[in-house]
Amino acid sequence: MTVSARPIVFAAAAGSLAAVGTALAGNSTGFADARADTEDAPDITNVSVSNDDGGTITLRETVSNRDVPESGDQLGFVFDVDQNPDTGSALYGTEVAVVFDGGRLDVYRAGSDGYLSEETPRPPSLQATFSGGVATFSFKASDLGITPGLGFNVTGTSFGGLGDADTAPDIRTFNYQMAAGAPPPALGPDTRAPLDDAVTAVGIPGLVAHLDYFASDGRGATADTIRIFHGRRVIKTIRYRLEDTNPFVAYVVRWKVPSKPKGKYRFCVSSVDAAGNKSNVDCARIVIL
């Protein structure tokens, strides 16, 4: 199984990475992200977060392979404003996203489809720049639904024009507290099911087809089952054990198309999270050329 990228708009130890990065100043911290872990997208290598006494939050993403954005690039952040991965969107429980492409700055909120799919007006306080390989975002906490003085979970995101992606941290979210030293809230039992999405695939007789799917879980871990159908009959079942899953990338299953295919083919994906919550079953066509 391999992965490919998912655009931003498609759409506490168990749920987030605690803010234990190197302290930069009062009410400020940051963390490093792996270098060269993306091919086409802006390669995020560091994220810093800070706030002032007036409630303005500033986030910076440092990328190693861009001085200025390239065509099709997106840089941004997704926020879990209530610090609860079991509410909000299926993307780690985030409720809001800010997306910057070098010329346009957009805001998205959780939609009825479970993703960050509803574009909303940009608050006046939200600003973004990209210069010297650093994307900087600033805004009033309350303008994005963050309670002043409290904290939030955040993930940095980047997407390239060819479909690659990077997230920081690589899995789950980073917890930041506006009051230095404050702990994140404790999480309750995980009762929320994952959300799966199969993507229409294309196959050529006798060759290997790539079957893409997304497995989105608030706490970022699923065991996945993929079933391939010829008509109504299951002809192959593929199972992956419970492991970390990133909702911003597509997981790719390889399947060799019969040399002389007849009839209709499709595949279906379903998942179970660490607490035993079962996802929806989502299916997509395999179009044989």
Language-model-derived ranges and their functions:
Residues 83-97, 144-188:
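Acidic/polar low-complexity flexible segments
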Residues 90-113, 119-127, 234-246:
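Solvent-exposed serine/threonine-rich low-complexity stretches and specific carbohydrate-binding patches
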Residues 27-48, 182-210, 289:
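Short, compositionally biased P/S/T/A/G/V-rich stretches that sit at domain boundaries
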Residues 258-263:
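Surface-exposed, short loops/turns at beta-strand junctions within beta-sandwich domains
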Residues 27-104, 158-167:
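Surface-exposed, glycine/proline- and aromatic-rich loop segments on solvent-exposed faces
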Residues 131-136, 245-254:
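Aromatic sugar-binding surface patches on proteins
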Residues 65-67, 143, 211-220, 230, ...:
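Extracellular acidic, Ser/Thr/Pro-rich low-complexity tracts
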